[in-house]
Amino acid sequence: MVKLAFGSFRDSLSAASLKAYVAEFIATLLFVFAGVGSAIAYSQLTKGGALDPAGLVAIAIAHAFALFVGVSMAANISGGHLNPAVTFGLAVGGHITILTGILYWVAQLLGASVACFLLQYVTHGQAIPTHGVSGISEIEGVVMEIVITFALVYTVYATAADPKKGSLGTIAPMAIGFIVGANILAAGPFSGGSMNPARSFGPAVAAGNFAGNWVYWVGPLVGGGLAGLVYGDVFIASYQPVGQQEYP
């Protein structure tokens, strides 16, 4: 059962909420800077060569490490979402209101866009790589993104949002980073392995190229929403009302 709640402007504009938006902006900026930066660095080192297995592994590791750190640095302030799909998945489960979630989205999208413009500047105008499907159709890309984003948001629920997580919560940032790295290894050659509308939106803004960008909104949001619905209804709802939970 979907537990979406609109929320109030008073709560969404409180001092604590404003700090959360700043934390999301900074953490998303740093994550995207490292993630997209790793792809630019690979292109520079190979003189624009095609992505090979070593490059895919390097980029996956960079994203995993950067997300691990980004979630860790923002977790105590905003919950460490860094991703509109994670925010949406948590909203579906009743962990964040729609209004606050929208403002999280704004912070995340701004952070990702600023990161890519910074990369464009500090690399002396290097092309910003954008996500796009390769060897598959856009619909197949959407399905791929649904599956891998479901895995990501399900991991967020299991390690961070579940009230019975106990000491497992201490490894949540690491687990979240690991699943993103693994999914990039699996989906990178096909859909790009985004799982994150902000991660795809920032490069599209900086490059001025939104071709196929809808894939990285529809897929991740559907996957994140399904994960929130499944984990929230099947597991969390069976032992504790959502209103009593602490995350984010």
Curated annotation (Swiss-Prot):
InterPro entries registered for this protein in UniProt: Aquaporin-like, Aquaporin_transptr, MIP, MIP_CS
Membrane disposition: Multi-pass membrane protein
Short sequence motif NPA 2: positions: 196-198
Biological process terms in GO annotation: water transport
Compartments in which it is found: Cell membrane
Pfam families, per database record: MIP
Stored CDD domains: MIP (cd00333)
Cross-referenced SUPFAM superfamilies: Aquaporin-like (SSF81338)
Up-regulation conditions: By salt and osmotic stress. Expressed in roots with a circadian rhythm showing an increase at the end of the night period, a peak during the first part of the light period and then a decrease.
UniProt similarity note: Belongs to the MIP/aquaporin (TC 1.A.8) family. TIP (TC 1.A.8.10) subfamily.
Function: Water channel required to facilitate the transport of water across cell membrane.
NCBIfam families: MIP
Name assigned to this protein: Aquaporin TIP2-3
Gene name per UniProt: TIP2-3
